[in-house]
């Protein structure tokens, strides 16, 4: 189905810079997200028909569309995030390419281009309307496509009371891209049986497995002396960091793994001979494998300290989120419904693990099972990001189908 306001909603949202800041100590991490929620989303939520609309100190804008059929007793939530990734988001100037011809798309005057030779996903979209960047910013389809789709679904249901639906709760939240947005989510206030994050990629994505995730911060303490007299005295902290890294499995890196394979990812190294710090992220799907990865890092640190004769390697491990499959597989109702709705719409569900996490990873462990459904974005987090308007329309169809489902 086509929705005349969907594109306008989306273009309005992406033009607002809501980039999050991992170094901030506030919630939300940037004032622009507060302004976007209170000045753009809250008025829009009221206009499209949501009731009891409010903004919480945790950064979430919340609203409700009451059920219009007493036989539909479920309460279902839909959640998308306001922030965008760590890439230029100031001055987003979207290009709307109607009836895409399958060829190269010039991204404004930037000199960058979307070429099917480089981005095979473009081969799916001839004849469709694509929204791209102008090459100077990201687009923000992650996750403003989700916000636009939820808003459009509510708008359509309000205008078409003949479509019977259950109670719907909507939540637009902050800071998903920096991994802290759902930390303060109020599950008791949201009060639904289950929810969906509308934060996936291409048409048909339906996901209920995520990584389990941890961060590892390492400190290597060296001893700096003049290199001319260093023998037997110098301890090079940079070399300690190299030695530690070389003891990790060389093939367990993001660029060499796929599917259900986990990894260690060296994110950052800074330092000198005297003192060096390294940051890793650890990812795996199975709980035992996840715990084994953390234990392996600790074992390497302990072994190095034993060989060095002092505690020169300090490891601090912090769990970040867990595989939501552990919660959702206890009651697959949200998956069963979404899968049935997609199939009824002629959409082939793509049920694959997320090699990452969503707000749903944390919200599921707060008592609200929250799988993820497609929002349409491709090449997210950079200048080559784009989205198909037709895929966004199908996401709206899916949301409407879920809340009207009577099975």
Swiss-Prot record:
Active site: 83, 176
Gene3D superfamilies with a match to the protein in the record: 3.30.70.360, Zn peptidases
Listed GO biological process terms: peptide catabolic process; proteolysis
Enzyme class: hydrolase
Keywords of the record: Aminopeptidase, Cytoplasm, Hydrolase, Metal-binding, Metalloprotease, Protease, Zinc
Documented EC number(s): 3.4.11.4
Keyword Zinc appears in the UniProt entry: yes
Subcellular compartments: Cytoplasm
Names of the cofactor(s): Zn(2+)
Cofactor: binding comment: Binds 2 Zn(2+) ions per subunit.
Positions bound to Zn(2+) 2: 142, 177, 381
UniProt GO cellular component terms: cytosol
UniProt-listed InterPro entries: ArgE/DapE_CS, Bact_exopeptidase_dim_dom, Peptidase_M20, Peptidase_M20_dimer, Peptidase_M20B
Positions with a binding annotation for Zn(2+) 1: 81, 142, 199
GO molecular function: metallopeptidase activity; tripeptide aminopeptidase activity; zinc ion binding
Catalysed reaction, written as an equation: Release of the N-terminal residue from a tripeptide
Task of the protein: Cleaves the N-terminal amino acid of tripeptides.
Similarity comment: Belongs to the peptidase M20B family.
Protein name from the UniProt record: Peptidase T
């Amino acid at each position: 189905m086509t929705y005349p306001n969907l594109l306008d909603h989306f273009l309005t949202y992406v033009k607002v810079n809501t980039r999050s800041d991992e170094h901030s100590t506030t919630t939300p991490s940037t004032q622009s997200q507060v302004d976007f929620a209170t000045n753009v989303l809250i008025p829009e939520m009221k206009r499209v028909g949501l009731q009891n609309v409010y903004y919480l100190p945790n950064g979430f804008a919340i609203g409700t569309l009451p059920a219009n059929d007493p036989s539909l007793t479920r309460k279902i939530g839909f959640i998308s995030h306001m922030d965008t990734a760590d890439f230029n988001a100031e001055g987003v100037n979207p290009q709307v390419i109607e009836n895409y011809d399958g060829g190269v798309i010039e991204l404004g005057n930037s000199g960058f281009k979307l070429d099917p030779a480089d981005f095979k996903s473009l081969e799916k979209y001839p004849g469709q309307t694509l929204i791209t960047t102008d090459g100077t910013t990201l687009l923000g389809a992650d996750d403003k496509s989700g916000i636009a789709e939820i808003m459009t679904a509510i708008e359509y249901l309000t205008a078409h009371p003949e479509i019977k639906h259950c109670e719907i709760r909507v939540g637009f939240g902050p800071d998903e891209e920096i991994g802290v947005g759902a930390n303060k989510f109020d599950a008791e206030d949201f009060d639904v049986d289950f929810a969906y994050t509308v934060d996936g990629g291409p048409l048909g994505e339906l996901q209920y497995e995520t990584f389990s995730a941890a961060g590892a911060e390492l400190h290597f303490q060296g001893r700096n002396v003049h290199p001319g007299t260093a023998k037997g005295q110098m301890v090079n902290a940079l070399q300690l960091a190299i030695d530690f890294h070389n003891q990790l499995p060389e093939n367990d890196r993001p660029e060499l793994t796929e599917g259900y394979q986990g990894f260690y990812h060296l994110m950052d190294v800074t330092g000198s001979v005297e003192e060096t710090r390294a940051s890793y992220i650890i990812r795996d799907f199975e709980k035992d494998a996840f715990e084994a990865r953390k234990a392996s890092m600790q074992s390497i640190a302990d072994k190095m300290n034993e060989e060095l004769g002092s505690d020169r390697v300090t490891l601090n491990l912090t769990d970040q989120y867990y595989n939501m499959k552990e919660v959702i597989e206890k009651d697959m109702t949200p998956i069963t419904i979404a899968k049935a709705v997609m199939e009824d719409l002629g959409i082939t569900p793509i049920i694959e693990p997320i090699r990452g996490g969503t707000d749903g990873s944390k919200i599921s462990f707060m008592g609200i099972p929250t799988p993820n459904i497609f929002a349409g974005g491709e090449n997210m987090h950079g200048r080559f990001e784009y989205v198909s308007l037709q895929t966004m329309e199908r996401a709206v169809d899916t949301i409407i189908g879920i809340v009207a489902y009577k099975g």
